[in-house]
């Protein structure tokens, strides 16, 4: 499909404050997932995936357990999802996903990130159509034909498979995430998935350079500092 999936692995947090932010975001997401779908990872597949992802990002076990205990208690905050869309510095498309217990506060916090960097927050749907909501898996390998055959045998729907420099990337509809993951694990028991996530993959990319590149990085840093922001998706190629 002519797309390249850019893997942005966040470097390990270098300061205690940065680590706490990562732990807090995972704790909130695990709490909401467990509260809505149950605290048993064997029954709640979304929770199982989230816990696996948290462990890969070195979130301590006590943070995960605290979120599960909080969800099982039935009390706690009532977080709701909120999504904001717009154009960042340099015109790149941006989607910001949040979990909030105060929608007005979250909107103002996110809006300030846009305003202070010359970005433009838009109406719902203004850029979502420029992204594909995909399940993405990435791992070391060279035999993409064997991967495709295994997925076809499992009747798993696949959007695209890319192979570059010894790395295979599988794209599938977001609804096929667990089916594709199960098929890969069963067909290739020794396979290590470096990336396994549901994300928004941009259909096209926008080059952001010079002063706009500096502003865009500041924009991302400001969003990262917002407690309610969980994920940021964009199509910027920052130079």
Curated annotation (Swiss-Prot):
GO terms for biological process: regulation of DNA-templated transcription. Pfam families: TACO1_YebC_N (PF20772), Transcrip_reg (PF01709). Keywords: Cytoplasm, DNA-binding, Transcription, Transcription regulation. It comes from the Bacteria. InterPro entries: Integrase-like_N, TACO1_YebC-like_2nd/3rd_dom, TACO1_YebC_N, Transcrip_reg_TACO1-like, Transcrip_reg_TACO1-like_dom3, YebC-like. The keyword Nuclease does not apply. This is Probable transcriptional regulatory protein VC_A0006. It comes from Vibrio cholerae serotype O1 (strain ATCC 39315 / El Tor Inaba N16961).
